[in-house]
């Protein structure tokens, strides 16, 4: 049974096995004393989390080994990095790059976001703000300096007949006296119950990245959509 079909079953079972207060009484004491049933829900929810993690890992692994955009090719530098080892529910990453210090990190969250939408929402905005705060933290730690966060922008993309909406924000900073730029792109895939973050990091002045980022983003989101569709079909 695939994740999409199995999740509701496990969740309903988990709810059915939530601890229920039970009252007992005696002749000496008419007061009710609550007694909790054994907890089974934690194990079931852990099972759901495990299934989601396996699906997210398979999804990030399904991304193409290379991504082309115009005349540029970005090859896989790190196929799958398991962030679950560091923090439960953290998710998985795949890293692309070229020979000129361009790094593209795809991050697929493992966060069980039920009821999420493919469109940009207040939740998307809040998640973007959280990641932008990380740049301030990097500056406070001395790893970055001269951090400048640009305006957030909602962008509509289309690829292979599919529509995608993302929230994007440019960030410029200096790292070891080198001027760099990051472009954060945040989208969502409701079928995978997950947000997708793509971070482009490159030396300032690389106009080719400005031209290619939308194509790369659309290709990645489309590949994840194809994976999700195949999972539903099986």
Feature annotation, model-predicted:
Residues 2-9:
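Sec-dependent signal peptide recognition
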Residues 13-14:
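C-terminal motif of bacterial Sec signal peptides marking the signal peptidase cleavage site
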Residues 19-103:
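N-terminal "mature-domain start" segment
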Residues 91-130:
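A short acidic-to-branched-hydrophobic micro-motif
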Residues 101-105, 163-165, 191-199:
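Glycine-rich, often proline-containing surface loops adjacent to acidic residues and nearby aromatics
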Residues 137-185:
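Signature of long, low-cysteine stretches enriched in small and polar/charged residues
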Residues 178-201:
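Extended hydrophobic
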Residues 193-234:
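Surface-exposed amphipathic alpha-helical segments
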């Amino acid at each position: 049974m695939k994740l999409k079909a199995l999740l509701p079953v496990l969740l309903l079972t988990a709810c059915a096995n939530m601890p229920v207060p039970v009252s007992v009484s005696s002749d000496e004491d008419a007061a009710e004393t609550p007694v909790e049933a054994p907890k089974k829900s934690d194990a079931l929810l852990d099972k759901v989390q495990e299934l989601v993690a396996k699906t997210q890992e398979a999804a990030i692994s399904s991304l193409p080994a290379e991504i082309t955009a115009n005349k540029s090719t970005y090859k896989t530098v790190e196929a799958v990095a398991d962030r679950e080892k560091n923090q439960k529910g953290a998710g998985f990453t795949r890293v692309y790059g070229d020979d000129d210090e361009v790094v593209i990190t795809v991050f697929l969250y493992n966060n069980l976001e039920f009821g999420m939408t493919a469109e940009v929402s207040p939740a998307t905005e809040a998640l973007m703000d959280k990641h932008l705060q990380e740049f301030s933290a990097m500056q406070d730690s001395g790893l970055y300096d001269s951090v400048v966060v640009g305006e957030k922008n909602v962008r509509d993309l289309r690829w292979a007949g599919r529509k995608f909406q993302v929230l994007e924000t440019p960030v410029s900073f200096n790292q070891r006296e080198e001027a760099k730029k990051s472009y954060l792109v945040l989208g969502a895939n409701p079928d995978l119950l997950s947000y997708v973050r793509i971070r482009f990091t490159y030396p300032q002045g690389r106009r080719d990245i400005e031209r290619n980022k939308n194509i790369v983003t659309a290709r990645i989101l489309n590949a994840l959509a194809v994976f999700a569709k195949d999972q539903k079909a099986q």
